[in-house]
Amino acid sequence: MAQSRRVEKVAALIRKEMSELLSNGIRDQRVNTTMITITEVEVSGDLQHCKIFVSIYGNEIQKDEVFSGLEASQSFLKGELGRRLQMRRAPEVVFKLDRGMEKGISVLNLLEKLEAERNIKDKKLIEFQE
């Protein structure tokens, strides 16, 4: 259980430091063009691997461009994390694109469409009965 708490604390620290680095530390213009949100950080039990899930605001072209900038900055970010967290070995950083918000919005749109279709059917049924 203690190891689990340690992993959670390290994940929280990585999230905090990575947020700071993404907003102020990267000079790559591709990364600075739009808003990036860190949605989740997963750290392995041995603290050697770190998956950072990001949500990127913008269209698909912008997202691809920003994501390629993040991937190009991985080694720099790993070094900065190691310095800031003062860890013996900084974890390998891997970025993953989180499409949860997009999927949630598409589900909501489908539900709204179904509700509209149902309302139309109910309205036609009421008109038919009159």
Swiss-Prot record:
One of its GO terms (cellular component) is cytosol. The keyword Cell cycle does not apply. One of its GO terms (biological process) is maturation of SSU-rRNA. Its main location: cytoplasm. It is found in: Cytoplasm. One of its GO terms (molecular function) is ribosomal small subunit binding. Keywords: Cytoplasm, Ribosome biogenesis. Belongs to the RbfA family. One of several proteins that assist in the late maturation steps of the functional core of the 30S ribosomal subunit. Associates with free 30S ribosomal subunits (but not with 30S subunits that are part of 70S ribosomes or polysomes). Required for efficient processing of 16S rRNA. May interact with the 5'-terminal helix region of 16S rRNA. Monomer. Binds 30S ribosomal subunits, but not 50S ribosomal subunits or 70S ribosomes. This is Ribosome-binding factor A. It comes from Prochlorococcus marinus (strain SARG / CCMP1375 / SS120).
